[in-house]
Every structure is written in structure tokens, then in C-alpha cells.
């Protein structure tokens, strides 16, 4: 084993943060140093040259001074007997670089902690430094040899029910955490007595997972008595009623991993499977929709819990039909009170929590990062979401109890696209190969299905922890690339059946696969790819290692499928074959036995149906009189409540421009304020049709009136999605995610009544279907605190997500008030019809109250009329701005519109109230509704349209936006409230800022927060030195000659399709080229005029961002010669964007004229930054930027490592004067800047892109390929038609070729 010291592992900011955390745990800690340590398992002595290559491979990341370590060593390594995702990627890179003597490379972090401390202190320090699920801590480098030792497999065990009877099974139930119910234990004893043998532990675990509440939805399928009355339908039956009443537009419901609805016809853009040339295929592009929850894991370990929640939902989409493509994501969090240190709010009363779960604040720091990191690395934009906190002590008939979200809601959802011919799964033929695609088995996430089905606190802490999985998004990206290559083959698609691997691991996925295909299966356990060979059969079969799919591939299609996997470097294995008889057999060649041999009907068959006999409880509530409150203090409290406050800290960490198909993200207008009501994507690059999604949830209302909370969730979804241009209301389809503390007094009846209100009444009245959903029935946390039994129970929680095809993505409305449209009016549409019900409002919550009467949807006809009028007015161009009314009420809606429009407000409430005591209720009630801005000369027409639709009593003109910073509200001519927009926006932004300060580099957070005080910030602007609507490539395109450009990707790259689309539009033939094609000699770069290295996370950024990719080219002789030859050709050009920019900067030794280039390292904020930034094009030789010098315009950025690091100040100066700086970040005034967030990565002198001395090779961190169409820009000038300014760059390349 070779031991190689690595670079320091912590930046100055992370170092001081960790040191502070350690000191809080152990006060004797006085110092800390951390560096990477690398360990290589070699089968022979390396030559001097090989050693040199290895040393260069392991030198990566920013230049931080190396120290001589002092203090006690805590060496954190991957758990022995496992192979970390880092190791498998780094070992792949080493092999690609010709280091064949290296069996495996592994990495740890050596923490040196100074101070005098006891063994107990040392244990506390070790606990803080590692994740015990995947890591261990040693005190000596030499002990790391255990990384490469091979454990012997553990044997199978049987449970003796023939001898020990029921007691033996009950004991196994507790020890294995199976969560079996009494009738399930009876069922298993009967079944195995019938088979005449004892069950194996693996069979019991498999049964427990497949039949857990998580997988079987027993409560939703149960029969019900309420108050002694038998109920006609099950919960699921009432949801299905929506489909039975209105099934039009739904292509698949209730039977697959996601639901499918009808989309639009467009030119679906992808590479031809045979020629690899990108092109558009005109066909129906249908929409798939799915929303999942991952609540239990997120409470225990928020980063991996939320990451694997997102990953699982993405796999659900990809595994729909015969393979589909995920497109855009959403995320949601509901937690208890945050209690931010130094920023605790008056309503946040500390109650405590059990040891086994983390705090609400920790969930909101780590969970969103986990979800965002997975989406970012996979390559899916995160475009909408919600965030709510709720924790309150309430009085019930049983005494006081705390209601809240110690067990959080973590929602991960999204939409994708699927081909018409692939919506339904195909037949699994007998003999079909049953394949696992993706990562290896590891002892991760055991028993997750059963664990998440229990109330938190009813299982052991170790079992809770064991049930959390860990993530490897780059592996999932490779799997998706395989699925994409398969569906792109059309009727030659080798996949006949596919499922994702989720709860229960293979023990649930393979039986489900063969059972759904009306087959049985014969499997060999040792064929399962396994990075932890010491596992017992139960652990191999039931672990929940992520990033895996199971597929059935016909024998005739197998070779085609195998070739695709090899090109994409995606691991797969044939684990079994499909049989005609419905028997499940798993053999084990190592031990020569059969751990599983049972009829599928025992596993998945007639387990007893649950019956629920429950009673309704009296509704609860308290007196709340808003008229007695000070309005100014109310405003401050409401603006700081997390459900109302800015969600910026949740948004800028997530890529929102990847795919180049995003038409509306959360950030609105020239000042990029996070207030959008819905998310919108384009169907493809050649059309203006698309898809919209929006969310609705009003969970605290359920404490007062559960059915009202369900109706309001649907209502809010509709008032949100109404901002997009949708043909008709019935085009909208809903996902319903139900969370309940089943068994808690009154909650089961509340659940039943709410499902009935939604499924049997409101949705049928609206003509809307719920074709997909999910339930989580154990939303309660129990613990003992110094002998006192405590619990926190969630309110019944329905989270609704709406999805719909969009007829024109250019007509999406936003809350940005327009000050360039003459005199305008603000009109309130109040669907509460003046009732102003204040129950469970944010205002009530910020005073520790609930109130008594909840807002509600009183009449479905009003909602239908509202939607139709808004769509008509939008179609006719009458609405300038739109925002729904929700949390915080009318005051918050109008303020958010003013924040987005950077203007003041003059509101008068005369038409809404009879006397001054009603004003608080008018300003803060959360009845359904919206505020629209219209030109004053159109106001009579707009009011008339609402009147004609029967909404005359719902509409009122409430004021005007004004062109200054003042917000004033009056009643009968008397001032009610006044304030400065800037200061109100700071209050609204402060909660987000406080969390950002704790999580990221505090200096950057301070700069961004202080920028809100700037009075004359003009926002994003465009100043062009060319005509955006001129196509300079047109004459060359007319010749019919289309030069070839190689669209280059490596495993983990995810930005290739939009890059190809931009070059294709500019008149090139874009060809899909994988690095594996170059290494294998399948592709010759001499065939290409141009090459572009695309964005993403090559090798998951292992060995540095873009560095592993670059080194696999530098140290592989075939690849090195190919690249060097290409760069030296005077007729070739090259572009590198984001990850491609990082990669090319590491190839500078092969690129003539690139000696001034920097190395790109971690952003100064220490965070992934996804924003719209202003850049200025510099005078340079870049062939891409000719005729653009001096132009200033916005561009999409999305990266974690974009900071340009030069060797020293002299090197920076040389670069500056060499004329090779191509782009610089500027602030909104057009000045070159290093300040955050205008310069999102802190690069010196604003450097954002470089070129070579002759201009043939250009690299940049921003993403022009994501904003080449006008509609792809989050904000754009109105005179941009189809093309955006960045299209010029690609056309310049086409003109240069001629």
C-alpha cells in the first residue's frame, strides 16, 4: 500500500467553522489542521514515470499552504470492507491514465486536533468528524491497510418458527426492525407452515419491505368505520374517483413509477443512435409527473436524506414506461421552529427534541444542500418549491399538545418527458435477462421502507440511522444516459420493463419487476455487483444502495444494451432470468444454497387487508382578534416568518438553467427577486409550447378544519399555476402527497374527511384529476426527556403539485410590477368574497394563536371562473403583472410585487372595509385570490370581464404602483401604514440571510444583504454593440455546408444537449462524442472543425473540478495525441464552458497560446452559485466574441468552482495585459467587480472567461448555451424576439469557419 499526503482539506472559512464546532463540543481543543490522505493498493512497484503520473493525478484543488501537522491524529476513512464512490471514480481515472498496476485508490482526511483531552473527549471529537454510516476513524496511517482487506461473506440464518412458533417470529420482528403487524405475523406462520419449512431472515426482510406501509399503502387501501358508520370507499378509491370522473389527457395513472399526461408536439432534440448527429424529431412529447417524500431519512441525516430523496424521485421518472427523461425538479420542506441563534422570533417557544434527530435549523441548512447538490450534479434544474415552519402548543379535548414537524416533510418532485410508444411497459418474455443497472451493493439504508413506516421514536436509534441511504448522483447520471440511448432507439428500444431500486433494495425491486410483468424470476445472489463482499445474503438483497434500476431486456436485445452501457461506462450485471412460473428463487453460489425460494403470491399476495375503526374529534381553536394588534409590528413579524420570507438561500444553491429549456424559474425581473408563482419549461428548442408546475399547501389550517386545508391546497395550486398560459382548467393534473400521524386521536378521521372533500367533491367539480401521489402515515415524534414523555405531532398535511401543458411559454405572468407601462392600477380578486377568515394565518401563528375559522374554497364555480378570466385577459395582453394571495395575505402579495418591480406602492383600502377595526384582517387574511396590475385605461374592461363571469363582488381596485421607494396604505384618506420598500425588503430577506450566514462564507452573505440598501441599483440591463436580431451566419447556412463540431462529454457531464442545440441553430452538424469514443479510437478529431467541452460534473468532480477529465486526456497517449493534434490545427476552434472550461484550463500544456490561463477553484462563497450575472465582453482575439467587445448583458451561471486562481499577482497582471481575458463580471452599473453576488465566484478583476493569443480556443465559466433563445432568459428586454444576444457567439464561430 502506498501512502501519499494530499493538499489541505479545508478552506480558511471551513477551517474556522469546524474549529468553532469542535470547541463547542470539547472546550480543550486549541487548534486544527486537516489534509487529504491518499492510499493506493498496487500489485507491483511503480516506475518513476508512473509515480510521477500518480503524483500529478493526486495534486488537485486550490493552492492552500501545506502545514506540518501537530496534534492528535483523527484519520477519517471509508468504512473497511467498502469502496467509496470517490474511490471507484479515482480508480477509473487512474486506469484511463494507463496506471494498470493500481488496483484501487482510496482517500481519507487526516484531522490533527491540538489540545489536552480525555478519551471521552476524543470520542466526541471523532463523532463530530465522521459519518458512522460510511466512515470510521483511526489513529495511525498504517492502519489504513484495512481498506484493501477482503472480508469473508457472512452466512444465511433461518428463523425457527416450526420449533419456536410465534415467539421466534416476534423476536425476529424486533431484532430486524421489520415492523410487521399482528395479522402479518399470523399470515407468515400460516404460509411457511404450509411450505413445510422455516423462513430465512432474507425472506422475512423481503416480505417486511414489500408489505410495509411505505410500499403497500395499507392505510390508503384499508376499509373504514368512522363513528361506527361503515364508509363506502377506501382513501385510494376516492382519489381514483377523480380519474373515473375525468380521465381525458391522462395516459398512465396509478400503475407505474410516475404518471403520464398528454403534452405537445415538438422537435425532440437528441443524437441519432446510429450517426450520433444531433437533430430534431417531430413527435408528441408527453409529460410525466411525480412527487415523492423522504421525511424519515431527512430527520436523521438531512444532507443524504434529502439528496437520496431527490435521487429516488429522479429514478422514478427515468423508470417510467420503457424509459423516460427527467426534466425539471421541485422541492419542499416543512419543519418545526428554526430558533436561529441571535435571531429567535417571539413565537418560537423551545420544547426540545430527541437525540436521534437533528434540529429544524440543521435540517434547513443541510437538507436543501443535499437536494440541490444531487439535482445539480445529475443535471436537472430545480424550479419551484415551498418552505414552511410550524410548531405550536395547542389545547385539545385531551389536554395541551405540541403540533409541529419534528419529523419534517421533505418533498422531492418533478416532471419529465416520454415518447408516445414508450408510455406502456412491454411484455417480459420468458428467458429475458433481468439486469441491475447502476452502482454496487453496499451496507447502506437497510430497512428504510419499514423504518419510514414507524413513528419516529418507536425503533432503535441504530436502526433509524441504518435506514438512511447515501448518494452518488454522477452514477445516476450515467444510468440516465444509458436510458436515454435506449429510448432514443425508438422501436428498437432494448428495455421492455424497468423499475427503480428504492425502499427494500433489490428484494423489493426484482419481485415487483417480474410480478408486474406476470412472470417469476430465478436470480443468482453473487451476480449482484457488490462493493462490500462481507455482507450477509439479507444485506446484499435488501440494502438500499442508491442509483440503481432493475430492467428486463430480451435476449435478442442484450448485446445492443451491453454496448450502450460500455460506451457510457455505466456498470450493470445480469442477475437473473424471467421464468414462466410465478416463483421467486434466489441461489447463492458461494454457499451453495437458495436463500429465497417462495411463490410470489406468498410475498406479494393476499396479506390481510387493514381495517380502520376511528372516531371524529371536536375541532380545536382559540380566540384571535387581529384588530387589537399594532400593524407595524405585525408587518415585521409576518415578513420574518419563514413561510413568507425570501427563499433566496434555498434557490441560489440550485442550478436553474441546465437543459436550456427553462422558461420561468423562481427569480423574477431585473433585480432577480424570488417570487415566481410557478415554473415553466419549453417542450423543446424549436417551439413556444411547454410545461408548467406549481405547488399549494396550507397545512396548519388542518388543525381547525382539515377538509378546508385540503381544498385550500388545491386552490392555492391553481392560483399559482394560473400565471402560466394554459388552454383550460381540466388540462391541469395534480399530484397529492398526504402526511398524517395515523393513530393519533382524531387524525384518521381528518384524513378520511379531507380525502373525501378533495377526491369526491372539489376535484370532480373542477374537472381535475389526481393521477399520482404518495402517502406518509407516521408523522409523529416521541421521546423521553429526563423522565417526561414528550411528543410532537404533525397536523394532517396535504401538499398538492399541479402540472399542465402550456400553450405559450412567452406569456407567463410574473409578480414584477411594471413601471414602464404608463399609469396602472392594482386590482384585488378576492375569492373569499370579503369573509377575511383569519384562522391559522401567519399573523395568528406569529402571535402563538390559531383562531377559529379557516379560509376555505366555498364555491368551485368561483375558482373555475377566476381561472378562465385570468387566462383570457393574459391571452389578450391585458395583465402586466400577477401574484396570488397566500401566506401573509394581501400585504405580502403587494409588497412582493413591489420588491420585484423595485418600486413603491400607494394602496387605499376604502372599498374593502367598513371600519378601521377590519384593516388587519383585510391586510393579513389568506383567503384565495390574486392581485393583478393592468393599464388604467384597461381597468373598466378588466372589471367588466370579472363581472360577466359572476365575480363582480370579488374585485376591487386597491391602488397603484409608484415610481419611488415609499409604501403607503390608507383608509378613508387616513394613513394606516407607511414604510420604505428597501427596508421592508431587508426585513423580508433577513431570515434567508441569517441562514446563509451560518451556512456559507459570512462575508459574502453580508455583501449580498447590504446590497439591498442601494438606492439607485438599475438591475440587469443590456447594452449591445451589435443587432440581436441579425443572423450573420445566414449566408453560410444558405450554402448548405454544415461543418462538424464535436460535442464532447465525459462521464458526469450533463450540459451537452443544449450546447448541441446552440451549434445546430448556428449552422453546424453537432456530433455526440464521449471520451470513451476517443480512448477506444472510435472517433477521430481530424473529422471535426470545432470541438466543445460541455458543462457538468465529470467524474463527480473527483480529483478536482474538470481535473480528472483533463488528466485522463493528458496521461493517455492516444487521447493526448488526438487533442494535441486538434489544438495545433490552424483551422480548428474549441470552446470550453463551465466543467469544460475547468477541463481545458488543465490541458493548457497542449494548447498553444494558453500560458496565461488560471486554474479554477472553489467559489469565494464556498457554495454552488446559480444566478444570472452581468458580464462585459472584452477586446480579445476570441473567434466567438468578434464584434461583441464592449457589450454588456446577463448570462446564466451555475458552478461551485469558478474562482480563477493565478499562480501569483504577476501572472494575473500578465493575463490582464496579454489580451486573453475574454469576459469580465460587472455590477448592474457596468463596473468590473469582485464583490458578491455580482461576481458570483470572487474571481480577481472579474475574470469570467479567457481565450488564447490567436483566439481559436475560448473558455468561460458562464453558460451562453443555456440562454441563446430569448425565452430561456430569466429576464430579457422586450425587443428580443426569438434570439437572445448570446446566439451571436455561436454564429460568429460559423462565420469564422468560412
Swiss-Prot record:
Transmembrane region(s): none
Gene3D superfamilies reported in the protein's UniProt record: 3.40.50.880, Phosphoribosylformylglycinamidine synthase, linker domain, PurM-like C-terminal domain, PurM-like, N-terminal domain
Active-site positions on this chain: 1138 (nucleophile), 1263, 1265
Record: residues binding Mg(2+): 677, 716, 720, 884
Pathway in which the depicted protein is active: Purine metabolism; IMP biosynthesis via de novo pathway; 5-amino-1-(5-phospho-D-ribosyl)imidazole from N(2)-formyl-N(1)-(5-phospho-D-ribosyl)glycinamide: step 1/2
Keyword match Translocase: no
GO MF, one example: ATP binding
Entry's family note: In the N-terminal section; belongs to the FGAMS family.
Record-given protein name: Phosphoribosylformylglycinamidine synthase
Gene responsible for this protein: purL
Amino acid at each position: 500500500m502506498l501512502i501519499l499526503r494530499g493538499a489541505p482539506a479545508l478552506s480558511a472559512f471551513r477551517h474556522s467553522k469546524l474549529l468553532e464546532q469542535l470547541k463547542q463540543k470539547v472546550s480543550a481543543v486549541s487548534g486544527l489542521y486537516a489534509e487529504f490522505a491518499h492510499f493506493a493498493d498496487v500489485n507491483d512497484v511503480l516506475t518513476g514515470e508512473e509515480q510521477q503520473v500518480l503524483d500529478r493525478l493526486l495534486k488537485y484543488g486550490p493552492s492552500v499552504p501545506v502545514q506540518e501537522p501537530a496534534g492528535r491524529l483523527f484519520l477519517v476513512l471509508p468504512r473497511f470492507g467498502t469502496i467509496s464512490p470517490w474511490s471507484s471514480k479515482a480508480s477509473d481515472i487512474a486506469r484511463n491514465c494507463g496506471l494498470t498496476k493500481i488496483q484501487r485508490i482510496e482517500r481519507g482526511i487526516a484531522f490533527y486536533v491540538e489540545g489536552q483531552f480525555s478519551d471521552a473527549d476524543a470520542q466526541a471529537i471523532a463523532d463530530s468528524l465522521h459519518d458512522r454510516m460510511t466512515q470510521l476513524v483511526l489513529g495511525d496511517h498504517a492502519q489504513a491497510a484495512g481498506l484493501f482487506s477482503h472480508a469473508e461473506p457472512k452466512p444465511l440464518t433461518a428463523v425457527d418458527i416450526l420449533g419456536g412458533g410465534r415467539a421466534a417470529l416476534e423476536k425476529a420482528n424486533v431484532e430486524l426492525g421489520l415492523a410487521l403487524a399482528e395479522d402479518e405475523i399470523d399470515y407468515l406462520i400460516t404460509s411457511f407452515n404450509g411450505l413445510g419449512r422455516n423462513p430465512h431472515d432474507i425472506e422475512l426482510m423481503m416480505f417486511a419491505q414489500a408489505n410495509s406501509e411505505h410500499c403497500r399503502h395499507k392505510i390508503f387501501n384499508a376499509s373504514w368505520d368512522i363513528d361506527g358508520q361503515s364508509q363506502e370507499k377506501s382513501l385510494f378509491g376516492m382519489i381514483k374517483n377523480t380519474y373515473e370522473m375525468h380521465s381525458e389527457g391522462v395516459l398512465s395513472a396509478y400503475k407505474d413509477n410516475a404518471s403520464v399526461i398528454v403534452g405537445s408536439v415538438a422537435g425532440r432534440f437528441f443524437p441519432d443512435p446510429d450517426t450520433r448527429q444531433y437533430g430534431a424529431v417531430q413527435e408528441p412529447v408527453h409529460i410525466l409527473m411525480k412527487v415523492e417524500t423522504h421525511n424519515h431519512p431527512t430527520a436523521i441525516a438531512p444532507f443524504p436524506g434529502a439528496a437520496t430523496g431527490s435521487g429516488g424521485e429522479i429514478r422514478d421518472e427515468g423508470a417510467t414506461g420503457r424509459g423516460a427523461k427527467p426534466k425539471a425538479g421541485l422541492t419542499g420542506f416543512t419543519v418545526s421552529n428554526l430558533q436561529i441563534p441571535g435571531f429567535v422570533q417571539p413565537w418560537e417557544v423551545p420544547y426540545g427534541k430527541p437525540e436521534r434527530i437533528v434540529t429544524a435549523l440543521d435540517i434547513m441548512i443541510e437538507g436543501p444542500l443535499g437536494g440541490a447538490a444531487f439535482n445539480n450534479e445529475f443535471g436537472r434544474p430545480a424550479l419551484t418549491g415551498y418552505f414552511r415552519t410550524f410548531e405550536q402548543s395547542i389545547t385539545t379535548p385531551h389536554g395541551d399538545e405540541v403540533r409541529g414537524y419534528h419529523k419534517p416533510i421533505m418533498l422531492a418532485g418533478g416532471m419529465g418527458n416520454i415518447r408516445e410508444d414508450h408510455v406502456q411497459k412491454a411484455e417480459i418474455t420468458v428467458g429475458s435477462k433481468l439486469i441491475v443497472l447502476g452502482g454496487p451493493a453496499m451496507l447502506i439504508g437497510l430497512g428504510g421502507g419499514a423504518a419510514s413506516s414507524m413513528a419516529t421514536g418507536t425503533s432503535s436509534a441504530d436502526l433509524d440511522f441504518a435506514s438512511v441511504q447515501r448518494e452518488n448522483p454522477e452514477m445516476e447520471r450515467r444510468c440516465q444516459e444509458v436510458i436515454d440511448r435506449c429510448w432514443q432507439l425508438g422501436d428498437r428500444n432494448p428495455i421492455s420493463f424497468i423499475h427503480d431500486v428504492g425502499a427494500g433494495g433489490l428484494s423489493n425491486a426484482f419481485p415487483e419487476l417480474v410480478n408486474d410483468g406476470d412472470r417469476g424470476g430465478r436470480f443468482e445472489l453473487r451476480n449482484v455487483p457488490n462493493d462490500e463482499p462481507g455482507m450477509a445474503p439479507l444485506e446484499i438483497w435488501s440494502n438500499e444502495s442508491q442509483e440503481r434500476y432493475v430492467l428486463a431486456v430480451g435476449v435478442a436485445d442484450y448485446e445492443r444494451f451491453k454496448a450502450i452501457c460500455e460506451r457510457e461506462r455505466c456498470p450493470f450485471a445480469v442477475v437473473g432470468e424471467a421464468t414462466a412460473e410465478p416463483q421467486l428463487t434466489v441461489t447463492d453460489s458461494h454457499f451453495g444454497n437458495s436463500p429465497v425460494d417462495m411463490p410470489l403470491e406468498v410475498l406479494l399476495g393476499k396479506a390481510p387487508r387493514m381495517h380502520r375503526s376511528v372516531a371524529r374529534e371536536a375541532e380545536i381553536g382559540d380566540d384571535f382578534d387581529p384588530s387589537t394588534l399594532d400593524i407595524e409590528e405585525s408587518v415585521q413579524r409576518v415578513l420574518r416568518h419563514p413561510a413568507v420570507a425570501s427563499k433566496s438561500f434555498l434557490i441560489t444553491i440550485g442550478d436553474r438553467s441546465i437543459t436550456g429549456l427553462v422558461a420561468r424559474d423562481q427569480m423574477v425581473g431585473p433585480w432577480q427577486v424570488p417570487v415566481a408563482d410557478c415554473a415553466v419549461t419549453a417542450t423543446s428548442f424549436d417551439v413556444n409550447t411547454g410545461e408548467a408546475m406549481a405547488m399549494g399547501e396550507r397545512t396548519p389550517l388542518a388543525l381547525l378544519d382539515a377538509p378546508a386545508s385540503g381544498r385550500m391546497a388545491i386552490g392555492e395550486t391553481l392560483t399559482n399555476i394560473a400565471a402560466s398560459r394554459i388552454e383550460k382548467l381540466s388540462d391541469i393534473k395534480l399530484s397529492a402527497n398526504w402526511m398524517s400521524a395515523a393513530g393519533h386521536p382524531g387524525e384518521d378521521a381528518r384524513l378520511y374527511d379531507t380525502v373525501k372533500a378533495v377526491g369526491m367533491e372539489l376535484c370532480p367539480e373542477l374537472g381535475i384529476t389526481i393521477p399520482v401521489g404518495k402517502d406518509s402515515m407516521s408523522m409523529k415524534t416521541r421521546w423521553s426527556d429526563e423522565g417526561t414523555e414528550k411528543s410532537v405531532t404533525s397536523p394532517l398535511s396535504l401538499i398538492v403539485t399541479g402540472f399542465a401543458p402550456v400553450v405559450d411559454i412567452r406569456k407567463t405572468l410574473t409578480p414584477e410590477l411594471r413601471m414602464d407601462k404608463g399609469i396602472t392600477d392594482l386590482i384585488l380578486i378576492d375569492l373569499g368574497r370579503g369573509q377575511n377568515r383569519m384562522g391559522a394565518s401567519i399573523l395568528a401563528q406569529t402571535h402563538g394563536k390559531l383562531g377559529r375559522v379557516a379560509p376555505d374554497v366555498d364555491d368551485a364555480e368561483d375558482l373555475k371562473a377566476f381561472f378562465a378570466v385570468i387566462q383570457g385577459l393574459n391571452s389578450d395582453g391585458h395583465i402586466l403583472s400577477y401574484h396570488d394571495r397566500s401566506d401573509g395575505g394581501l400585504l405580502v402579495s403587494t409588497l412582493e410585487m413591489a420588491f420585484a418591480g423595485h418600486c413603491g406602492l400607494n394602496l387605499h383600502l376604502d372599498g374593502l372595509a367598513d371600519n378601521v377595526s377590519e384593516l388587519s384582517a383585510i391586510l393579513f387574511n389568506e383567503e384565495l385570490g390574486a392581485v393583478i396590475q393592468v393599464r388604467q385605461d384597461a381597468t373598466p374592461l378588466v372589471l367588466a370581464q370579472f363581472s360577466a363571469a359572476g365575480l363582480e363582488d370579488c374585485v376591487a381596485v386597491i391602488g397603484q404602483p409608484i415610481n419611488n421607494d415609499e409604501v403607503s396604505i390608507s383608509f378613508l384618506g387616513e394613513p394606516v401604514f407607511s414604510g420604505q420598500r428597501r427596508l421592508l425588503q431587508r426585513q423580508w430577506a433577513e431570515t434567508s440571510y441569517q441562514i446563509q450566514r451560518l451556512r456559507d462564507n459570512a462575508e459574502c452573505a453580508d455583501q449580498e444583504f447590504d446590497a439591498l440598501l442601494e438606492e439607485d441599483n438599475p438591475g440587469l440591463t443590456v447594452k449591445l454593440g451589435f443587432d440581436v436580431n441579425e443572423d450573420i451566419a445566414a449566408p453560410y447556412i444558405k450554402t448548405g455546408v454544415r461543418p462538424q463540431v464535436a460535442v464532447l462529454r465525459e462521464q458526469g457531464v450533463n450540459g451537452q444537449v443544449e450546447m448541441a442545440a446552440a451549434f445546430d441553430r448556428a449552422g453546424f452538424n453537432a456530433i455526440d462524442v464521449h471520451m470513451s469514443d476517443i480512448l477506444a479510437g472510435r472517433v477521430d478529431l481530424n473529422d471535426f472543425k470545432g470541438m466543445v467541452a460541455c458543462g457538468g460534473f465529470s467524474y463527480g468532480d473527483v480529483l478536482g473540478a474538470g481535473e480528472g477529465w483533463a488528466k485522463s486526456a493528458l496521461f493517455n497517449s492516444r487521447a493526448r495525441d488526438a487533442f494535441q493534434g486538434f489544438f495545433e490545427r490552424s483551422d480548428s476552434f474549441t470552446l470550453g464552458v463551465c466543467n469544460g472550461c475547468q477541463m481545458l484550463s488543465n490541458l493548457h500544456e497542449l494548447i498553444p497560446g494558453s500560458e496565461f490561463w488560471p486554474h479554477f477553484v472553489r467559489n469565494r462563497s464556498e457554495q454552488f452559485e446559480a444566478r444570472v450575472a452581468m458580464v462585459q465582453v472584452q477586446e480579445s482575439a476570441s473567434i466567438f466574441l468578434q464584434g461583441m467587445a464592449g457589450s454588456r448583458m446577463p448570462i446564466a451561471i451555475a458552478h461551485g468552482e469558478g474562482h480563477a486562481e493565478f499562480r501569483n499577482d504577476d501572472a494575473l497582471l500578465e493575463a490582464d495585459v496579454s489580451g486573453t481575458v475574454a469576459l469580465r463580471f460587472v455590477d448592474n452599473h457596468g463596473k468590473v467587480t469582485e464583490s458578491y453576488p455580482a461576481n458570483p465566484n470572487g474571481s480577481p478583476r472579474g475574470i469570467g472567461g479567457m481565450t488564447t493569443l490567436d483566439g481559436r480556443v475560448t473558455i468561460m465559466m458562464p453558460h451562453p448555451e443555456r440562454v441563446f433563445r430569448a425565452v430561456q432568459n430569466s429576464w430579457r428586454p422586450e425587443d428580443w424576439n426569438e434570439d437572445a444576444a448570446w446566439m451571436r457567439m455561436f454564429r460568429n464561430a460559423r462565420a469564422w469557419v468560412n
